[in-house]
Design a protein with these regions (language model features):
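Second-shell loop/turn segments in exported
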Residues: 26-33, 105-115, 129-139, 155-160, ...
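Short, low-complexity, polar/charged sequence segments that are solvent-exposed and flexible
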Residues: 38-41, 97-99, 109-114, 155-156, ...
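Short, surface-exposed glycine/acidic/tryptophan-bearing loops
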Residues: 3-8, 13-25, 147-191
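Acidic, serine/threonine- and glycine-rich low-complexity intrinsically disordered segments
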Residues: 65, 82-84, 90-102, 110-130, ...
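A well-ordered secondary-structure block
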Residues: 21-75, 169-238
């Protein structure tokens, strides 16, 4: 993914491609669904699942920013942009066996943390690049600040920009040595991957404004566990 305008991710298991995601290129494996299609077209042409089953547990699908479709060989997740006429903006394809053999819907592997954070940053910069905006540079202090807040939300079991010490995002950024002219914070919890977290935020007006805002630096911090299973914080500043 050196060329961010041709962004895609490929999942490989036992030397075989078992998963694919892209928000810039169409795939012949997407059952005819293409980027730019409208939600009504997808719904009229495909049968949508209303739950996702992992082992013996059913997870109800009640979010409006994506649909899940089952084909003979795969599960296709179609992501929409509610601020751009509900057009398809991302397509994830997971092989049927891979999806159905998953042990759990949430990861508990802390080694995945950095990948989750990196993917989230890549997705943000692709959104910005596509709109002619500057890409955000990785910032270590902002990343540490974001991770600390995600960890605190998990450990103290709350979900808020203001922590239990009554510190705002801006208080925390200053504490981590960030000198800013403008800053913002996004938080998310409960999503099963960096992709789902990204589109949840992009379909929320205030969070979207931050992602596409006038900033230069970003830090993303993710932790797993707790009552929401995953906590994500994004710190932006200039």
């Amino acid at each position: 993914n050196q060329d961010i305008d041709k962004f895609c991710m490929i999942g490989i298991s036992k030397n075989k491609v078992v998963a694919l995601f892209s928000n810039t290129m169409n795939s012949c494996e997407s059952n005819g669904i293409k980027l730019g299609d409208v939600e009504s077209k997808v719904k009229s042409e495909h049968k949508l699942l209303d739950y996702r089953r992992i082992k013996n547990t059913r997870y109800i699908l009640n979010e409006k920013y994506y649909n899940l479709i089952k084909t003979k060989s795969s599960y296709i997740t179609v992501f929409y942009d509610s601020f751009e006429d509900n057009k398809v903006v991302g397509i994830q394809i997971i092989g049927k066996k891979t999806e159905e053999n998953m042990a759990e819907i949430y990861t508990s592997d802390e080694s995945v943390t950095t990948s989750f954070e990196n993917i989230n940053r890549y997705l943000i910069n692709e959104e910005r690049s596509r709109r002619g905006l500057n890409m955000l540079s990785y910032d270590e202090n902002a990343t540490l600040c974001a991770r600390a807040h995600s960890k605190d939300m998990r450990d103290q079991d709350y979900f808020s920009h203001t922590n239990l010490k009554n510190q705002s995002p801006f208080d925390r950024m200053i504490q981590y040595g960030i000198n800013y002219q403008g800053a913002a914070e996004n938080i998310a919890a409960g999503q099963t991957s960096a992709i789902f977290a990204h589109y949840a935020l992009m379909n929320s007006e205030g969070h979207r404004v931050n992602i596409l805002g006038n900033y230069r630096y970003i830090g993303v911090g993710v932790v797993f566990g707790g009552s929401s299973s995953m906590y994500l914080t994004q710190n932006f500043y200039r």
